[in-house]
Design a protein with these regions (language model features):
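Bacterial N-terminal signal peptides that target proteins for export
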Residues: 1-10
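Sec-dependent N-terminal signal peptides of Gram-positive bacterial secreted proteins and lipoproteins
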Residues: 13-15
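Bacterial signal peptide processing site
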Residues: 22-25
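N-terminal glycine/threonine-rich, aromatic-flanked beta-hairpin/loop signature
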Residues: 59-117
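C-terminal motif of bacterial Sec signal peptides marking the signal peptidase cleavage site
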Residues: 17-20
Length: 190
């Protein structure tokens, strides 16, 4: 499988095992209505991201339950399918029941030149994610805080989202699932 090079941290001159922070990298300024710098995110197209074991913990809220808060293992997979003008688009798949079922949603979000991330996940309930594109363990990672709900129930989860490819062990056995693979989890599409 072709490995992608990720361009993150160019605004700060960050050096990691990533490529693309040199002269000629695509950083474009948009000036309407205010100046917002964005970058070329095409390296993220056709990439998958997942939650490693250490970051599965999330909390579910249910107003009619006792206790109202319950710890859950929240595995989420992102598959970015396109990028345009500083926006990433694709599909997200979430499971809080060890991979027995997956909730698909369409994801649209932006990554600014200073690596601030804002993602919207659209399905029957809107999920909002905010965070940073960072380097963790020498690889790119999304450090995200996610919240979804309708008032009487909801889910809050923070995690590092790491890239995953078919050569990774977790590809065929996602953490927090009963031996579920990325292809199985994403088979329904969004």
């Amino acid at each position: 499988m072709l490995k992608k090079s990720f361009t993150i941290g160019c605004a700060f001159g960050l050096i990691a095992t990533l490529q693309g922070c040199g002269i000629g990298d695509s950083v474009q300024a948009q000036s309407s209505p205010s100046t917002l710098a964005t970058k070329d995110l095409s390296a993220f197209v056709n990439t998958y991201w997942y939650v490693p074991t250490d970051y599965l913990l999330g909390y579910s809220y249910n107003a009619s339950a006792n206790p109202k808060l319950t710890a859950v293992r929240d595995q989420t997979i992102w598959h970015f399918t396109s990028a345009n003008g500083g926006y990433l688009m694709g599909c997200s798949f979430e499971s809080t029941d060890n991979g027995a079922s997956w909730k698909p949603s369409t994801v649209v979000g932006s990554v600014t030149v200073n690596n601030t991330v804002s993602l919207g996940f659209y399905s029957n309930i809107l999920t909002v994610g905010a965070g940073q594109l960072v380097v963790s363990g020498g690889q790119p990672a999304f450090l995200m805080q996610m919240t979804a709900g309708v008032g009487a129930s909801g889910l809050t989860h923070w995690a590092y989202m790491l890239p995953i490819t078919p050569s990774d062990r977790a590809w065929t056995n996602l953490p927090g699932t009963n031996n579920i693979s990325v292809p199985t989890a994403t088979a329904a599409g969004c």
